[in-house]
């Protein structure tokens, strides 16, 4: 899962959206640096990552990547799940339009920015102003996201080529998304993530 899915599942679970978004920027035990609700959001994010990576649908999808891109398949798939969530948002969350949800999420996350790591603050400067969460529905934007990550981290250069794996297996990936994401939503609503 990437930004949008973590925020959405956190909302469904009444967990800290701030902590769920911040989690990738925090190493070790967050309890000494953040309030309890943010800490619980960080831990929820970590649990979601482990659960998602071990889902049979996700493990199967990783196998569809070519040898030269399989190493970056988990990252590519996380971005792709956000694509499907953004694309199908009106079906998934008919009572909370995406633009309104993004505004709500932004307001929640903004409260922790003064005490956040600089890299997280930098991400937030772009995430909201450039409307990444809404633009995830556009596959051209997904390609730009993958290229951007490859540019920032040369060891992830294979992300550029992973676009072709997504394109080749688009329909099957979308089908897998519909298999597992509603289950994860139900787990979040039961606070079982």
UniProtKB/Swiss-Prot annotation:
UniProt EC number: 3.1.4.14
Source domain of life: Bacteria
GO BP field: fatty acid biosynthetic process
Keyword 4Fe-4S: no
Job of this protein: Converts holo-ACP to apo-ACP by hydrolytic cleavage of the phosphopantetheine prosthetic group from ACP.
Single Gene Ontology MF annotation: [acyl-carrier-protein] phosphodiesterase activity
One Pfam family recorded for the sequence: ACP_PD
Protein's name in the database: Acyl carrier protein phosphodiesterase
Regions that span the bilayer: none
Keywords recorded for this protein, A-Z: Fatty acid biosynthesis, Fatty acid metabolism, Hydrolase, Lipid biosynthesis, Lipid metabolism
UniProt keyword annotation of Lipid biosynthesis present: yes
Homology family: Belongs to the AcpH family.
InterPro entries referenced in this protein's UniProt entry, alphabetically: ACP_PD, ACP_phosphodiesterase_gpbac
Reactions catalysed, as given in the entry: holo-[ACP] + H2O = apo-[ACP] + (R)-4'-phosphopantetheine + H(+)
